């Protein structure tokens, strides 16, 4: 017994044009045309969804994953270095406030970079090169070394001028930082209109900002590493309070005995017994 195959339904859209489709077959033509239109729309939506997903987190078309209702416009538009649209507190709602916060973040990020470096370098030099810093190698004990005999010993070199007066040290620091900050805020020594955040010139002796593409990349690297440095400095502060040791000594202790020297082990010491 041989089974007969069902007859194939002709593709009316390919057989006839819109104007040539016979009246008796108009219904079949319309059905196939509707299916084709739906398929085309689905394909267009898929392409649109694929292309929009690339801009989901970056650039002016990005949407914030934290704002599920999208009830307010997304103001960080990706035009600033390190802007990825994460502003759950709405700190960028007011442009003037956002401008101020951006300036404060960048200045503190730079201070964090220098501060984190200054917190670990004396300890590294004391351990690796054997420079006799004494207690001044620990960053939170360095200031107290001014009150010791001989004052603050720079690099263990007796021929250098050592800080022995905390008032004079503070005054010199205020003057030096005031001159630099005044230069930056006023746009140069004679109000030359330099960018207060990226003044260049004397602040860029190596010419790192000469190439625009390289400069844009360095801006992002600076703010990202600066944010990490600020968190690192916060961690160093907490370590100093909890352990009474510097960051390098804490790291050495942790590597020697991770089970006993870690954040959880120290946290349990402060729990009620």
From Swiss-Prot:
Record PTM: Photoregulated by reversible phosphorylation of its threonine residues.
Protein residues bound to chlorophyll a 6: 254, 263
Species whose genome carries this gene: Dunaliella salina (Green alga)
Domain notes: The N-terminus of the protein extends into the stroma where it is involved with adhesion of granal membranes and post-translational modifications; both are believed to mediate the distribution of excitation energy between photosystems I and II.
Keyword S-adenosyl-L-methionine: no
Protein name as annotated: Chlorophyll a-b binding protein of LHCII type I, chloroplastic
Compartments (UniProt record): Plastid, Chloroplast thylakoid membrane
Chain segments carrying region Disordered: 1-65
Positions contributing to chlorophyll a 1 binding: 86, 92, 105, 227
GO BP terms in the entry: photosynthesis, light harvesting
Gene Ontology MF term list: chlorophyll binding; metal ion binding
GO CC list: chloroplast thylakoid membrane; photosystem I; photosystem II
């Amino acid at each position: 017994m041989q089974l007969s195959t069902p007859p194939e339904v002709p593709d009316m859209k390919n057989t006839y044009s819109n104007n040539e489709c016979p009246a008796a077959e108009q219904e079949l033509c319309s059905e196939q045309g509707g299916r084709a239109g739906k398929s085309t729309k689905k394909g267009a939506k898929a392409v649109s969804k694929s292309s929009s997903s690339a801009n989901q987190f970056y650039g002016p078309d990005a949407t914030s994953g934290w704002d599920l209702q999208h009830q307010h416009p997304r103001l960080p538009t990706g035009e600033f270095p390190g802007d990825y649209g994460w502003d759950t507190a709405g700190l960028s709602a007011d442009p003037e406030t956002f401008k101020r916060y951006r300036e404060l973040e960048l200045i503190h990020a730079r201070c964090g970079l220098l501060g984190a470096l200054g917190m670990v370098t004396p300890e590294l030099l004391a351990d690796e090169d054997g420079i006799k810093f004494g207690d001044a190698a620990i960053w939170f004990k360095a200031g107290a070394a001014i009150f010791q005999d001989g004052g603050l010993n720079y690099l263990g070199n007796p021929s250098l001028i050592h800080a022995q007066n905390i008032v004079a040290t503070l005054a010199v620091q205020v003057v030096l930082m005031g001159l630099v900050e005044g230069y930056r805020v006023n746009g140069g020594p004679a109000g030359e209109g330099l960018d207060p955040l990226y003044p260049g010139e004397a602040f860029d002796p190596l010419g790192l900002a000469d190439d625009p593409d390289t400069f844009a990349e360095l801006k992002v690297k600076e703010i990202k590493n600066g944010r990490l440095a600020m968190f690192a400095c916060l961690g160093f502060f907490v370590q100093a309070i909890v352990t009474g040791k510097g960051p390098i000594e804490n790291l050495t202790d942790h590597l020697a005995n991770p089970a006993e020297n870690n954040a959880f082990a120290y946290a349990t010491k402060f729990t009620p017994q």
